[in-house]
Amino acid sequence: LVAPYLMEGFDAALISKSLSFLRKDNVFMEISAPDLKTDQVEPWFNVPYSLSVGEIETVGFKGASLNLPPANPYLPNNLTLLPEDNETISRVTDRPDLQVWLDTDVTFGTPRANTSILLLTDGGLSSQKDRAYAELYRRLVNDTLSTTVYPAYLAGLGYALGSSEAGFSISLNGYQDKQMQLLDTVIDHLFNAELTQERFATFKTGLIKDWQNAAKDKPYTQTLSALNTLLVSSSWSPAALADTLAPLSLNELKKWQTGKLAKIGVIAVLHGNVSAKDAQTLEDFLQQKLPMAAIAKEKSSVADITEKLLLNLDVDHNDAALLLYVQDPDDSFASRAKSGLAGQILRSAYFSSLRTDQQLGYVVNAGIRRLNTRSGNLFLVQSPKAGAADLELATLTFMQNYVDSWQNLSDAEFAQQKSGLISRLTESDKNLGQRSQKYWQNLNDENYNFD
């Protein structure tokens, strides 16, 4: 159910051989904790550690018994493939507090489905405080679910819990038969997670450390993050998020969670081996389970670049990096198509010029960068030998030279590039998940034509 293979035989000799390696003298144990006694320092990363060789001590296992796990409640009973209806995705429920979209799709021949649910919260989760708190709460809920949903994973089901400026999202994938049971579990934990002070402190410390460590990311990675923070209204720097989270207490997080989940609007998509009956079951479940209300979807905005913006980053790294972003004039499909074609034409030429010819850096890329529904052309390079000013000059020189030589591009070459982009954009979906993702992206963009 989990893997794309089937175990059909029982190999006692192989199992015995594998078990023979489970010995006290054949164990590697790593302990990571604060205030450990160490006697050595790793020279490259300056990390203190200690190393001891010998058998490990085993305690606390006397009298332990082994038992088979209980029956897996998520094992599918119904694996019947529905008949293909040849209909496109459509909205089967349209209420102020609930939208449900459905596409019965058995093109890929498996009794699987993908369910995506956006839980709209009043005011969204777009502020610096909301983004920080939501990420911590998301991690804590996943922690409380880890043991509970493991049987679902073994039964071929999966879930993901996310957050955005609009609210929390839940996605389910796998055999459709027991997805509602898994959804019930996930929603119950999202609304009623039993959080302890110990786990709260552990995850809060870990998240703050993750955000603080973003300052140690590769320079080009930091430039991409800074671009988002600069232009997207709901994007905040890792350092700012860490500072916001630092004074938070468990009681404050619980109070925030209660307020944010007091009223919920829902947008849901069912795609795959699912029918109108499944959509109605989902609607009834959500109506019973959630405090439904008409909630406006919070949308982040992207700032217009009306003049040259220069942002200098203080990066603790020997390399220098440059990111140059040319924003589309608007968010129309026409503008996105033009910048997409420009990105395809420029990609190999930019790489060839800065990486191959000038050997300025090992990270060289030209393409498009989409922020919400607004796209633009991006030029990115990281170099161990040239400074940021030199990288900027090299990029601007490349752009000017390319513009000057534009007339040398033949009609046949241009048509070939355009045809290549069209082929890539219209490429058939390889699996159910890829098609589901396109549906979800179009709904987020409010492109109800799904083109």
Regions found by a protein language model. Give the residues of each.
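Buried hydrophobic packing residues in well-ordered domains
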Residues: 29, 135, 170, 186, ...
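M16/insulysin-pitrilysin zinc metalloprotease superfamily fold
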Residues: 1, 129-130, 148, 166-211, ...
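His/Glu-based metal-binding/catalytic segments typifying zinc-dependent metallopeptidases
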Residues: 1-3, 33-35, 43-136, 293-349, ...
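Hard-cation-handling environments
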Residues: 1-31, 37
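Extracytoplasmic
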Residues: 24-26, 95-97, 110-116, 133, ...
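A structural supersecondary motif
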Residues: 142-161, 169, 323-327, 343-383
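Glycine-centered hinge/linker elements that transmit conformational signals in sensory
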Residues: 282-295
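Scaffold signal of the M16-like zinc-metallopeptidase fold and its non-catalytic homologs
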Residues: 1-10, 21, 214-263, 283, ...
